[in-house]
């Protein structure tokens, strides 16, 4: 991640929302450059580290929080759970998300794992930690990203417009206290990982339930369809 001002890296609405942690974003850029200088790579690639914040802040109606990026080289693209269109096979968690998507909404299974269309339609796909060392899960937890993403979540919740947070797993559920205030509802279930999907993720209908909560608050539903 190059040393640039926050408003050059993210969408204008997000630049304002993240202003309280601008110095922390700068510090994280310094951390990543130090990692590279020490011969340690990170994922996703530099231009994608803040990708979740390049979509309009004011248009977010759904928040889906992941833990940290996929540690498999070639998988992480800066949006939680999403992968590049050419990635095969899909990560198991994403395959389970797509199975629930098909069961919940009746749509065919998507042709690839690229969730960019969701992000373009108002779904914030945010990892709690925005980078990871390749093949080393959770390696950048506790390095400082949590302050940045906590600020982002609180800023979303503080708006007066409706939003639904989809919280998958225990780690995501701990964020519920940050969502207090504003007009934010939440949906909780086990994580879609193979270890927990059969314990309540399958059958939880997060996509249709989120749209019901949005329309009940006078907001437009999300078009969840993927190619």
Swiss-Prot record:
GO terms for biological process: base-excision repair, AP site formation via deaminated base removal. One of its GO terms (molecular function) is uracil DNA N-glycosylase activity. Its EC number is 3.2.2.27. Its main location: cytoplasm. It is an enzyme of class 3 (hydrolase). It comes from the Bacteria. GO terms for cellular component: cytoplasm. It is found in: Cytoplasm. CDD domains: UDG-F1-like. The active site is at 68 (proton acceptor). InterPro entries: UDG_fam1, Ura-DNA_Glyclase_AS, Uracil-DNA_glycosylase-like, Uracil-DNA_glycosylase-like_sf. Keywords: Cytoplasm, DNA damage, DNA repair, Hydrolase. It holds the Pfam family UDG. It catalyses: Hydrolyzes single-stranded DNA or mismatched double-stranded DNA and polynucleotides, releasing free uracil. Excises uracil residues from the DNA which can arise as a result of misincorporation of dUMP residues by DNA polymerase or due to deamination of cytosine. HAMAP family: UDG. Belongs to the uracil-DNA glycosylase (UDG) superfamily. UNG family. This is Uracil-DNA glycosylase. The gene is ung.
